[in-house]
A protein has these predicted regions:
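A short, proline-enriched helix->beta-strand linker immediately N-terminal to the Walker B motif
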Residues: 133-137
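The feature captures the beta-strand-to-loop junction immediately N-terminal to the Walker
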Residues: 33-35
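Helix-to-loop junction immediately C-terminal to a conserved catalytic motif
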Residues: 48
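Conserved ABC ATPase "signature" region
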Residues: 95-110
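Hydrophobic anchor residue at the start of the ABC signature
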Residues: 128
Length: 193
């Protein structure tokens, strides 16, 4: 589903990914762990096609890819429900309407509220609801649980695990999150795997 071969990426003179090779099968779940600044987020961005490596190749054969960023990227003039609706392709027969995704993630009361009326944790759950409603076959999750308390995090992880058979790449600093989501852990150090 996703294959990176000898991927290199730099920001100016700072090389953040050096000869990274990685293969992710359909339905497989991996967690990228390592120190801050080692390239975990950059690897997700390259995998999503948001950044082009200066060398190497990226083959993403997923029909639909969804990415949840560290900081929720919600449209501020839309309600939570409308932010989720945006990802549902026209004419798609979805398994669940947007408000159901919000309910499953414990924020049904936020459906009609704009992002500026929500806490950081609630905004993050709206972003997760949006990704799940898209019914992607590849989910790229960049520290999606960092703004959540322990109980909420546990519920959200259970919801994700029970709601999708998508391949997942999770960026996290928490081995417990990786284990709860059923991820194989890949350690990155400076510049590589």
């Amino acid at each position: 589903m996703l294959e990176l071969k000898n991927v290199c990426l730099s920001y100016g003179k700072l090389e953040v990914l050096k000869n990274i090779s990685l293969r992710l099968a359909r339905g497989e779940r991996i967690a990228l762990m390592g120190p801050s600044g080692c390239g975990k987020t950059s690897l997700l961005r390259v995998s999503a096609g948001l950044q082009k490596p200066y060398s190497g190749s990226v083959i993403n054969s997923a029909e639909r890819t969804a990415m949840v960023f560290q900081e929720p990227r919600l449209l501020p003039w839309l309600s939570a429900e409308d932010n989720v609706k945006l990802t549902i392709p026209a004419g798609a027969k979805t398994s669940s309407p947007p408000v159901n995704w919000l309910e499953r993630l414990g924020i049904a009361e936020a459906a009609k509220k704009r992002p500026d009326e929500l806490s950081g944790g609630m905004q993050q759950r709206v972003a997760l609801a949006r990704a799940l409603a898209y019914e992607a076959d590849l989910l790229l999750l960049d520290e999606p649980f960092k703004a959540l308390d322990a109980g909420t995090k546990e519920n959200v992880i259970k919801t994700i695990s029970g709601s999708t058979d998508a391949a997942i790449i999770l960026v996290t600093h928490d081995a417990g999150e990786a284990a709860a989501l059923g991820c194989r852990v890949i350690e990155l150090d400076t510049f590589g795997l």
